[in-house]
Amino acid sequence: MLVDLIARKMREEGYTIVAMEGNLLPLPEDEKIPIPWKIRRHRPDVIGIGMKSRRVCIGEAKTHDDLFSRRTATQFGDFADIIGKSSGEKAELIVGVPLRSRDTLLQLLEKMKLHAEDISIILMPEELADDENEDHL
């Protein structure tokens, strides 16, 4: 569900989804969106392209526990390498987390010296996050 919210925000901001983990978008029967390609060592959940601006948007969903992992730190570091370098324009990063994880995410971004103007945050209400976790059990 969080990946869907990230994809929706991308579309609202004018990006066309070109790759998405799980292929959850409603598409005609014959069409599929490819899984995202790796950015350095990591594959994001969603990639969008601004067809007019040619900007890239990277979307990544994280659980609360993910925010404490070394993998998340290296992943954000890899993504940060292209923020500001996409076709001479700034690439955007959208991160989705459960509402309770907001402060933890902000602390991680600050520790990594990733600036808020390059990153959008989507906060998912706990009730929805709990439902999503139950679906994966």
Residue ranges and their predicted role:
Residues 16-53:
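Active-site metal-binding core of divalent-cation-utilizing nuclease and nuclease-like domains
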Residues 92-137:
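Domain-level recognition of nuclease-like catalytic cores that cleave nucleotide substrates
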Residues 38, 67-69, 99-101:
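Acidic-and-aromatic substrate-binding clefts and catalytic sites of carbohydrate-active enzymes
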Residues 44-69, 79:
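Conserved catalytic cores of phosphodiester-cleaving nucleases, focusing on short active-site segments
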Residues 80-90, 114:
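Arginine/glycine-rich "motif VI" loop of SF2 helicases in the C-terminal RecA-like domain
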Residues 1-11, 15, 19-22:
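Nuclease catalytic cores
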Residues 1-4, 70-80:
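Well-ordered, non-membrane alpha-helical segments in soluble/globular domains
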Residues 21-23, 62-63, 97-100:
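Structural motif
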